[in-house]
């Protein structure tokens, strides 16, 4: 079976025109999306989020009674040794 190579000519002028249009379109989208982001608002939200993380850390830490945990661990260890 013969292998026939079909070459099509590339229109360099057409390619340049498409590249220019594409580059122009990217600029429009870049500006459009960038203008929708309020940097000051994002900073404010990040600060609020960081402050809330501290509150949750304190809240959960205060629910743990370290002395009670130590006693439970000691009792469990004693029971383990008795059953061995």
Curated annotation (Swiss-Prot):
Regulation: induction? Monocistronically transcribed in the late sporulation phase and cotranscribed with mutY and/or fabL during exponential growth. However, sspE is not translated during this period.
Biological process according to GO? sporulation resulting in formation of a cellular spore
In residue numbers, the region (Disordered) covers 1-84
Q: Which cysteines are joined by disulfide bonds?
A: none
Q: Where on the tree of life does the source sit, at the highest rank?
A: Bacteria
**Listed InterPro entries:** Spore_gamma (IPR006341)
Listed A to Z, the keywords are: Repeat, Sporulation
Q: Note the segments forming the sequence repeats.
A: 21-47, 48-74
For bias kind Low complexity, which ranges apply?
45-57, 71-84
Composition bias of kind Polar residues appears in: 1-25, 34-44
Site annotated as Cleavage: where?
32-33, 59-60
Identify its protein family. Answer: Belongs to the gamma-type SASP family.
Q: Which NCBIfam families does the record cross-reference, listed alphabetically?
A: SASP_gamma (TIGR01442)
Biological role = SASP are proteins degraded in the first minutes of spore germination and provide amino acids for both new protein synthesis and metabolism. These proteins may be involved in dormant spore's high resistance to UV light.
Q: What is this protein called?
A: Small, acid-soluble spore protein gamma-type
Q: Which organism is it from?
A: Bacillus subtilis (strain 168)
Tell me the classification of the organism that encodes this protein.
Answer: Bacteria, Bacillati, Bacillota, Bacilli, Bacillales
UniProt lists the gene as sspE
